[in-house]
Amino acid sequence: RPKLYLFGLSLGALGCEDSADLKTVFEDPIQGAVWSGPPFPSRQWADITRNRNAGSPSWLPEYRDSSMVRFTGQKNALNNDKRWGPIRNVYIQYASDPMTFFSPDLLFHKPDWLIGERGPDVSPHLTWYPIITFLQIGFDLPLATTPPLGYGHSISAANYIDAWIAVTAPTGWTDQDTARLKQLFADRPPPG
């Protein structure tokens, strides 16, 4: 069969994760996936983030040897010098995305993304308070797609390009090809 890659944005990432259960992947493996802005109920994303390598932040986790799954944000963090396995999965997420980092646990527990090094787009003035931070991030949910591209739940084309190149590893593709493709999208007006 032809190569099969999965894609999901937001709730699509949640559904896409569920469609690629482990048994199915073993029986008839996909080649990879790009999941962007995974919402907080995403079980696979939550498990990987919870079990990330020590020292890697929850907003940009490293998982095991990075051969099967990698995370990226505003800056390309896919570390293409590391060896990939036969299945390549990339999560695109921004630390300022309330869809990804909201949690009912915010009611009474300080989240990992506010402990230690913060994401580049999380205000240093954001302080966790029981109940209050839960409400603040909860109120951000309906506005998650209103920030400019590259912030919140507004994923930029450049980040998609980096992710798809990492996942598909197109033969003969060069850094110049990537730069040209990114420029093509940068020259287009934003959607909406």
Q: What are the functions of these language-model segments?
A:
Residues 1-2, 21-192:
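C-terminal His-loop and adjacent cap/lid subdomain of alpha/beta-hydrolase
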Residues 13-19:
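Hydrolases whose catalytic domains are alpha/beta-hydrolase-1, hotdog thioesterase
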Residues 6-13:
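Gly/Ala-rich beta-loop-alpha elbow adjacent to hydrolase catalytic centers
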